[in-house]
């Protein structure tokens, strides 16, 4: 009888063990994740001056269009497009790799969705480039500008989610 009592004390009940579950292990990111995150952050920092420059050139074209301004507007647009492509690849890849990490998941997902919406908006902006030879040039300009500023707004919101939400 004493042996059973000793066994009961030494051998914990299965229910007690189930009630005190160990915390989940820390999430470990790969070296590739960290490299992509670094590229992504550098690209994000470069985006702010590019978008500002593009907005200023675009406003100048809207007020007083010249061929030189249009050329520079196109060059900066290609730069923004390339940078967005790189950040979309690195960001989406890291979003997929980090999908099982519960810490900051909603913030990362909100950022990713906002930036993908901005991607689509910038593509639509490029496809809606005004053509001076068309009779509806004024309407095209307005649509292009609206798409551009909406896309910039989405990108800014996505940027802010990570900048201010990353404790």
Q: For each predicted feature, which ranges?
A:
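Generic hydrophobic-segment detector
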Residues: 30, 34, 81, 101, ...
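Short, solvent-exposed interaction modules
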Residues: 93-141
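Terminal recognition/anchoring or ligand-binding modules at protein termini
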Residues: 139-167
């Amino acid at each position: 009888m004493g042996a059973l009592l000793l066994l009961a004390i030494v051998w914990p009940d299965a229910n007690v063990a189930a009630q005190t579950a160990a915390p989940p292990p820390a999430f470990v990111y790969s070296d590739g994740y960290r490299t992509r995150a670094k590229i992504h952050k550098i690209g994000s920092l470069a985006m702010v001056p590019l978008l500002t420059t593009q907005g200023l050139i675009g406003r100048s074209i809207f007020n007083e269009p010249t061929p030189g301004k249009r050329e520079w507007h196109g060059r900066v647009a290609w730069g923004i497009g390339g940078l967005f492509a790189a950040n979309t690849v690195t960001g989406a890849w890291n979003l997929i790799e980090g999908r099982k990490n519960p810490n900051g998941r909603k913030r990362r997902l909100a950022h990713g969705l906002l930036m993908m919406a901005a991607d689509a908006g910038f593509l639509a902006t490029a496809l809606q480039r005004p053509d001076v030879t068309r009779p509806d040039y004024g309407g095209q300009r307005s649509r292009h500008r609206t798409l551009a500023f909406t896309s910039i707004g989405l990108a800014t919101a996505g940027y802010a989610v990570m900048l201010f939400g990353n404790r």
